[in-house]
Every structure is written in structure tokens, then in C-alpha cells.
């Protein structure tokens, strides 16, 4: 809710979330903190978290113990590290960026303020695109808890003209 207070002075035209309940709950908390009572919202599966395939639902620390640190870091932070029956970050990029370009970017270019609530990996994929991050550097791209990224777009620009980071201290929950 404290993070939402950083948005009090912003008028949003629309919100986008993934189709997963966690982002709906986060959006509700942000809107409450910003004292926004209604906002048109679009739920899009293209913004969903990475599919971890056979690892979905597993405790990440148990997985790390089972597969070792190198494979664990490859899965969590690698660009094209395979997961059995799941997605790589490259796969997430391949669905998030086209959705952004066709659905969200035109609104930004029309001067709308868009609130996007997504997951760590879908945001990391979008950051790769917006911030021109090379594949080799993706392991170091983080979206920490308690931060909002604010990208500014001009009507003729396909990429942001400015990026700000807003943050509050939030105690991370061990997930």
C-alpha cells in the first residue's frame, strides 16, 4: 500500500495486469494506496509470469538443493536456459514484447498514462527491450520488491525517453 502512495498524484487512463491473481491483488493494493477507486483494467495472459514447467509449485530452495547452484542460477537468471516443459526468459520476451508493442505502446504514444502490474520475469523481459539490455547481461537485471519503474514516452517514440525508479522499503517475503 505504501508503494501506491507514490502514485497519488498520477492520473491513470488504464491498467494492465497479467491473468494471474497475484497481479490483481497487487493492483488492488496499489490503487488503494493511491486512493484510486476505479480504473479500467485489462488482464492479459501475455504478461503472465514465466512458466516453470515441471518445477512449477516447487520450493525454490529445495530445487536449488536438488539441481545444484549452477543449474539453479541458469534457470532463474539465464536468458535461454531450458526448463523441462516450461519457458525460458527468451520465450517470455517473445510473448511480452509483441503484446507491449501492439496493445500498450500505442496508448503511451497517444499520451495515456498506463499502469502495468506484472511479474519479475515478464518485467525483466520488457526491461531488456526498453533499456536495450544485451542477452549476456540479463542475469544481472533485477526487479526488486518495493520499486516502481516509470518510463516516459513521446508520441513519435517507440522507446522511452526517460526512466525513473520510485521505491519504498518493503520487507521481502521468502518465497
List the model feature ranges, each with a label.
Residues 10, 66, 78, 110-111:
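Structured helix-beta-strand junction loops
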Residues 23-26, 50-53, 82-83, 123-126:
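Short catalytic/ligand-binding loop motif for oxyanion handling, primarily in non-cytosolic enzymes
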Residues 32-97, 142:
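Phosphate-handling substructures
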Residues 10-46, 71-73, 130-131, 152-175:
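Conserved histidine-centered catalytic loops in small-molecule metabolism enzymes
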Residues 1-38, 66, 84-96, 139, ...:
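Active-site-proximal alpha-helix that buttresses catalytic centers in soluble enzyme cores
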Residues 24, 98-159:
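Active-site-adjacent alpha-helix immediately C-terminal to a catalytic or transition-state-stabilizing loop
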Residues 17-20, 46, 77, 112-113, ...:
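Short, well-ordered beta-to-alpha junction loops that form the rim of enzyme active sites
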Amino acid at each position: 500500500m505504501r508503494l501506491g502512495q507514490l502514485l497519488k498524484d498520477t492520473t491513470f487512463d488504464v491498467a494492465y495486469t497479467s491473468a494471474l491473481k497475484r497481479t490483481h491483488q497487487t493492483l488492488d493494493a496499489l490503487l488503494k494506496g493511491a486512493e484510486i477507486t476505479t480504473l479500467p483494467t485489462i488482464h492479459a495472459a501475455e504478461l503472465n509470469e514465466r512458466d516453470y514447467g515441471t518445477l512449477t509449485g516447487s520450493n525454490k530452495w529445495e530445487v536449488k538443493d536438488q539441481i545444484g547452484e549452477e543449474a539453479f542460477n541458469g534457470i532463474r537468471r539465464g536468458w535461454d536456459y531450458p526448463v523441462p516443459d516450461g519457458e525460458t526468459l527468451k520465450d517470455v520476451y517473445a510473448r511480452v514484447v509483441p503484446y507491449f508493442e501492439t496493445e500498450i505502446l500505442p496508448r503511451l504514444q497517444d499520451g495515456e498514462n498506463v499502469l502495468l502490474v506484472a511479474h519479475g520475469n515478464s518485467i525483466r523481459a520488457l526491461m531488456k527491450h526498453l533499456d536495450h539490455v544485451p542477452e549476456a547481461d540479463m542475469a544481472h537485471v533485477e526487479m526488486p520488491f518495493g520499486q516502481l519503474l516509470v518510463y516516459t514516452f513521446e508520441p513519435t517514440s517507440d522507446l522511452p525517453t526517460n526512466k525513473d525508479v520510485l521505491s519504498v522499503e518493503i520487507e521481502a517475503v521468502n518465497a
